């Protein structure tokens, strides 16, 4: 019985490792697909800011690899942010949750436009027309802009704020990817 129990534990551990490898492979192949489709530059995240600093990361590709300022950055699942500074070997990417981030945004279901801005932990979309019948769960994607192609997932609506005195409404999004767990990204030229 003890040997069977030990063997079972080893098989469970091996199964867990295989699931992790399968997930990593799936993510990597998805990243290759994004890079190929947009002729993007694959990069690794090599630096995160200290707590309570700006919401930016450092990637391991710079001007020598073809990265330029204002290019969009994606990961499997959606928008990461935008390149704001480029060195020869690395670049700084401001995340969509940073206060300085502004992206043209569209609610996919009804094509209602707004501006997505960072709010440190989430993304807020302002200036959506007041009578748009928004719903929690609506997906918001990029509109046509300087840094991004249109139709890329930004996040999902988790809260709707309808202003009485304004002609627009605001929604709060949960970003489409876990920005705290970034590893590999693709810089996408526009």
Kindly label every feature range from the protein language model.
Residues 2-6, 10-190:
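A secondary-structure micro-motif
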